Amino acid sequence: MMLRRKLSVVALAAGAVLAGCSSTPSDDVTASWSPNKLYAEAKDELNSGAYDKAVPLFEKLEGRAAGTMLAQQAQLEKAYAHYKANEQAQALATLDRFMKLHPASPAYDYALYLKGIVNFNDNLGMLSFLSKQDLSERDQKAAKESFESFRELVTRFPDSRYTPDARARMTYIVNSLAQYEVHVARFYYSRGAYVAAINRAQSAISDYQDVPALEEALAILMRSYDALGMAQLRDDTRRVLEKNYPNSAYLTGGPRSTQGPWWKLW
């Protein structure tokens, strides 16, 4: 998995016992450990899924290796441990601190990627946007923040190894946000709140381009106009639907023929 790869920022061979650590409490079993050993132990805990043990070890490493690349690595590893432990707020706070302290870090692209992943809140893997989990009913604020992190990544680091996956997730997020508007419009239509349905369908159409959800947005718009007796607007919308989706099931008054989430490709 991409997030578990060793980052190039690590320079394990450069580790040495740093000055200023002599005040470590005597009951600290890590007191005599070198930064490299401390990192190795923390990494072992992380890889074994013992995130509650990994986090404090990475925190110790941050202090002992302060000012070094290994300290930067410890911050990123700690953020990842928080993420894997489903501690989203702590992960985001750690990443924000890292990016504030190290704007020129060679691992900045990874920090942006991980921040996007944390907000994306996806534990199913790189291709989970093909699963049955429908993001249209999830927290849209987090989705937008995730999109912004990915957008900064692909803009600033177009050649990053994380950019291709970030682009794919950006497309998925845009589709999800559009579908959310349609989801709300559908709800209003089903309750007879046709003006509200029109407003949400129009938001989807105006804010998003070339996304699958627009077909249903047009259909809801057409039917809402019809329910309100607005024949001219209904017919105009129908012509747009016919032009863009000539084979749409909505044109015959039936539901869309596909089954499952709108974004599931196969």
Question: Residue ranges of each PLM-predicted region?
Answer:
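Acidic, polar-rich low-complexity tracts and alpha-helical solenoid repeat scaffolds
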Residues: 2-8, 21-266
